[in-house]
Structures are given as C-alpha cells and as structure tokens.
C-alpha cells in the first residue's frame, strides 16, 4: 500500500502561488518608470532616437525582446551592473521593458558589439520625455544615453571612452536637430563621471531623484548649444576628489 506524501502538493501549490504573486507584482510595476506621462505636444511629436551607425569593429543593432532578454538579464545581474543600474530583473521583465521601448517613441534599446561579440546594452532616450527633463532647460530633441558594459574587463580597459565618441558623432549626424547628448550617472559613479568629463561634457549639478542622487551632464553639439548651468549643487567629480 502506497502512502500519499501530503507535503508535496502543499509545497508545489505554495511555489506556484509565490510565482503567480511575483508575476502579478512585476506586471503592476511601471514598465518604463522614467518616462514622463505629461509632456507638451511639441515634445510628444518628436520621434524616438535614431539608430547610430558605427564603423567596424564596433556595431549597434536594435535589441530583440525575445532573443535578447535572457542575455540582458544575465548581464544586469552581474555585480558591477547591479550596483550601477539597479535593474537585476528576470528575463520576463526585461522582455516587457524592451518591448515597451520598441512600441513607443520615448527610447530605443540597443545591443552594441565589438569585433562581432555582443558586449554592451545601450538605451537612447528623448531626454525631454524623461524624468531628468525638469532638472535642466531641456530641448525637445535632446537625446540621453545609458550604457551597460557587460564584461568588467572591457570596463577596466577603457571601452567606454572608445565607444562613446562614435555613438555621439553618429547621433549628431543622423539627427541634425539634436543639440545635446545627456548623461545622468549616479553621483557616486566616479568612473562614469570621469568618462563624461573626458568627453567634454558640461556639468549641470547633482540632483535628487525618486530613488537616487544623480550627476547631470550635457555634451553639446557646439559650445553655444550648452544648457545654462545655473547654481550648481555640487562640483565636477575631479574637483570633488581633489578637494577631499
């Protein structure tokens, strides 16, 4: 005579219930939490950022929600990107995040490669449609860049200063109405801040956001395109470090 193990069905049901609750919780979260829901008609009419064209050995392509979600999720769960991005999401949430960007006009998710190997996740977004817009004199055609380099070895070898100028040059060429490229690293991310300053960005101060304090930078097409700095809330990273 076989005895039923009454514990197993209970555990199985409990596991399914937890999984379902997790899915519900994920579904209720904003898919694009930084996108502004109220913008002017002028800002709303501006299309999504263009796809930059890079010369070999670099390349950028649109991210595929179905094909790339697993890879991006694995990247974003690596310690250095958990710290920098705080997006250690499971693949299903990344799939929703990618699809929402592709379906809208706010941002575009991209995969960057070097010598044919995928190495970086990039988001180009319209800064005037983003939560950073109220923090400076945003122009409807400004474009922001977020980049997540997957391999820490590439980070340590200065990959960002090699990639960034190529992306910026292509964006300015393709979108002649874009006057500025925006960056908003965490105020503690000295590596990203040094890249911004190396590129010649204008520092627009540190600003408290909903979940973090960010350092805002603008890379203008020409010096005349730089937004006004106003009363800065902090010094550039180099000055902060040298004075401490």
Swiss-Prot record:
The keyword Calcium does not apply. GO terms for molecular function: N-acyltransferase activity. InterPro entries: Acyl_CoA_acyltransferase (IPR016181), Acyltransferase_MbtK/IucB-like (IPR019432). It is an enzyme of class 2 (transferase). GO terms for biological process: siderophore biosynthetic process. Substrate binds at residue 146. Monomer. Belongs to the lysine N-acyltransferase MbtK family. This is Lysine N-acyltransferase MbtK. The gene is mbtK.
């Amino acid at each position: 005579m076989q005895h039923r193990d009454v514990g197993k069905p209970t555990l199985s049901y409990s596991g399914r219930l937890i999984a379902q609750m997790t899915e519900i919780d994920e579904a209720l979260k904003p898919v694009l939490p930084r996108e502004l829901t109220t913008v002017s008609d002028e800002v709303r009419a501006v299309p999504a950022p263009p796809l930059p064209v890079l010369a070999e050995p670099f390349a950028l392509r649109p991210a595929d929600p179905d094909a790339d979600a697993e890879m991006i999720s694995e990247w974003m769960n690596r310690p250095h990107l958990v710290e920098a991005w705080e997006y250690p999401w499971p693949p299903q949430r990344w799939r929703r995040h990618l699809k929402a960007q592709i379906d809208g006009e706010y941002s575009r998710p991209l995969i960057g490669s070097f010598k044919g190997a995928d190495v970086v996740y990039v988001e180009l977004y319209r800064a005037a449609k983003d939560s950073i817009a109220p923090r400076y004199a945003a122009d409807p055609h400004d474009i922001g860049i977020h980049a997540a380099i997957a391999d820490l070895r590439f980070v340590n070898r200065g990959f960002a200063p090699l990639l960034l100028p190529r992306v910026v040059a292509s964006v300015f060429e393709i979108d002649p109405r874009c006057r500025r490229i925006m960056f908003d690293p965490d105020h503690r991310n000295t590596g990203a801040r040094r890249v911004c300053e190396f590129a010649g960005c204008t520092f627009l101060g540190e600003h408290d956001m909903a979940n973090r304090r960010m350092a805002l930078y603008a890379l203008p097409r020409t010096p005349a395109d730089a937004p006004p700095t106003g009363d800065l809330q902090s010094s550039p990273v180099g000055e902060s470090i040298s004075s401490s």
